[in-house]
Swiss-Prot record:
Annotated disulfide bonds: none
Function, as annotated: Transports viral genome to neighboring plant cells directly through plasmosdesmata, without any budding. The movement protein allows efficient cell to cell propagation, by bypassing the host cell wall barrier.
Keyword Transport: yes
Region ranges (Disordered): 162-242
This protein's name: Movement protein
Domain of life assignment: Viruses
Source organism phylogeny: Viruses, Riboviria, Orthornavirae, Kitrinoviricota, Tolucaviricetes
Pfam family, one: TBSV_P22
Organism field: Pothos latent virus (isolate Pigeonpea/India)
GO cellular component: viral capsid
Ranges of compositional bias, category Low complexity: 203-223
Length: 242
């Protein structure tokens, strides 16, 4: 139950001063909160518990489980979970239709943070919904690399003032599902029904709507497990050093 690297277990590998490690991490869940930090809650991750880190090559994907016709609206935020001031909101997407799905990417986020002191996390907030429960409206996944060092990373700016900089970009992910559903057609034995009260398939979307974590790169992953500590039995974690 720990992250494995190609050379063994990650942990005491930052003994050399100024050595920079890059670790690939991924996480999938149906919860509204998705961490982007090596916080102590994930003690099973044998990641250095001191030093500094910066998230790079971040890809957050929201996969809808509902039709866009439901008109469920929401926003995605990247926040500092220990800061209660307005500046805790480091990034906020525009309001969007959750049924369309969403992809948020950031190549070089301007965060250079002490490990464990500033746990960052994505938060999905449903603003408008006709459903009483929101737990099954979507699933989220994030894949990112953690650049870690025993000393502050000079290539990465401080977190101060980062909220004012457009470090991330987003785009609807619904077009991906339309492209993947092309050419499906009807099976040969299926015929159109002329009955006025026949069952209609209108409004049903393919399970590929919005993409999924399977679309994220996974060739380099060497460890994967189910973790219930975060309150979600379907959460999946994996990681590998690069």
């Amino acid at each position: 139950m720990e992250i494995q690297s190609l050379d063994g277990v990650l942990g005491e590998e930052l003994a050399i001063q100024n050595e920079v490690k890059k670790i690939l991490l991924s996480h999938k869940t149906t919860k509204a909160i998705l961490p982007l930090a090596p916080i102590s809650q994930f003690s099973k991750w044998k990641i250095p518990k001191q030093g500094f880190y910066a998230p790079i090559d971040v890809k957050f994907v929201l996969t809808p489980h509902i039709s866009e016709r439901a008109q469920v609206r929401g926003v995605v935020k990247l926040v500092d979970s220990r800061d209660l001031s307005p500046s805790r909101e480091l990034y906020r997407s525009k309001e969007f239709n959750i049924g369309h799905g969403l992809v948020i990417e950031g190549s070089q986020l301007p965060f250079c943070l002490p490990v464990g002191d500033y746990p960052l996390q994505f938060e999905v907030t449903v603003l408008q919904s006709q459903f009483r429960e929101t737990a099954n409206l979507y699933s989220t996944s994030v894949e990112w690399r953690m650049m870690s060092s025993t000393t502050p990373l000079s290539r990465v700016r401080s977190v101060m003032g980062a909220a004012q900089q457009p470090a991330m970009k987003l785009q609807p992910n619904f077009k991906m599902s339309l492209e993947s559903s092309k050419g499906g057609g009807m099976k040969p034995h299926q015929k159109k029904s002329s009955k006025p009260n026949g069952h209609s398939r209108r409004g049903n979307l393919s399970g590929e709507v919005g993409g999924s974590s399977s679309s994220l790169p996974s060739g380099a992953q060497t460890g994967e497990w189910i973790d219930n500590d975060y309150g979600d039995g379907s959460s999946e974690y994996s990681g590998v050093s690069t």
